[in-house]
Amino acid sequence: MNAWEVNFDGLVGLTHHYAGLSFGNEASTRHRFQVSNPRLAAKQGLLKMKTLADAGFPQAVIPPHERPFIPVLRQLGFSGSDEQVLEKVARQAPHWLSSVSSASPMWVANAATIAPSADTLDGKVHLTVANLNNKFHRSLEAPVTESLLKAIFNDEEKFSVHSALPQVALLGDEGAANHNRLGGHYGEPGMQLFVYGREEGNDTRPSRYPARQTREASEAVARLNQVNPQQVIFAQQNPDVIDQGVFHNDVIAVSNRQVLFCHQQAFARQVQLLANLRARVNGFMAIEVPATQVSVSDAVSTYLFNSQLLSRDDGSMMLVLPQECREHAGVWGYLNELLAADNPISELKVFDLRESMANGGGPACLRLRVVLTEEERQAVNPAVMMNDTLFNVLNDWVDRYYRDRLTAADLADPQLLREGREALDVLSQLLNLGSVYPFQREGGGNG
């Protein structure tokens, strides 16, 4: 059956700021306390969506979450009106305010793990929300992510959206950022490659930075998503590269159809893994980048592998890269050699995503890939599909509500909370989502 990959991109939220919340993500740590520009961040993301949509790659948008997230501050013992809660936490424990104001939901590669209908036992598209257990600020995302996905994939005959796994370290799950699908045409059954960093009883794990994904979580997600057991491989990421800042697999590898583009040191037991994939995926092609040409450090600093590998109708592929790759002579030199070599990659497309990159999120972090048949695509909430009208509407919305300068101190401004709620109220109507945010369901108000 014919099917296409639709990229659902996360829209950057109004409180996008640099707080260095993500230990193990070196860009996040390096840019801590810099001044951010939420308006520019949102527009950079929108331009990527629109440019790819115009090039014939189906695109959709996933909206931001409510931030600062007052209910969690109340759980932490801060009381009073919303304004009083903000004032107290800013004075007594500003690190909590930064955490509950993170715009990290924009990296929707961590929102969920997807199983296309061609791979599932019941013939539905399955989406399992990620619990993002390893980082407090990200562990807050799952309930609203679930509401948003159910509002977008709202036809229960075609889509099953599963709640996140229990919030315990043993079941730490980071979503599609640690998941690859390999195969032929999108509508054919594919091989799902789940990548984990640690498993219970196995001492092979990183020592400097945390391994966020467990094998136990990956196995549970595969079960929830009803993936045919004959179409699953579990592989461990190389713990040495996690210790060099590769906090998700999508920082060291990207797949599309029959191609796996990865660093030579991406996986533990990589030779055996690639042999297994060759045996089980027709036409499988591994493009391994040698450490002598691109070091792991350079891969992390440029986000070479946090790229999007997109298929054209003729079978050729486009590699979507952040501007940092073009600015690094060694990486750009390698990429031009890659273009000239015998492989499906025929074009490099570069985007300026500096606002997201400075927090450790490149092109691939910003998108959730969902393979859909034509019938399934028709069943998606049409209001989220990117086109000329939506692009203009969202740019106007960003101009109206987003600030062009934000520091950690600004997060205590009650006006920022009010602006955010008003903006999301309007956005949920524009995207026909219903009441997906807690402030809407509580009768809301702005105070």
From Swiss-Prot:
Q: What does this protein do?
A: Catalyzes the hydrolysis of N(2)-succinylarginine into N(2)-succinylornithine, ammonia and CO(2).
Q: How does it assemble?
A: Homodimer.
> Any idea which residues are catalytic in this one?
E174, H248, C365 (nucleophile)
The EC designation for this entry is 3.5.3.23
GO MF assignments: N-succinylarginine dihydrolase activity
Protein's name in the database: N-succinylarginine dihydrolase
Which species does this protein come from?
A: Escherichia coli O17:K52:H18 (strain UMN026 / ExPEC)
Under Pfam families, the record lists: AstB
UniProt enzyme class: hydrolase
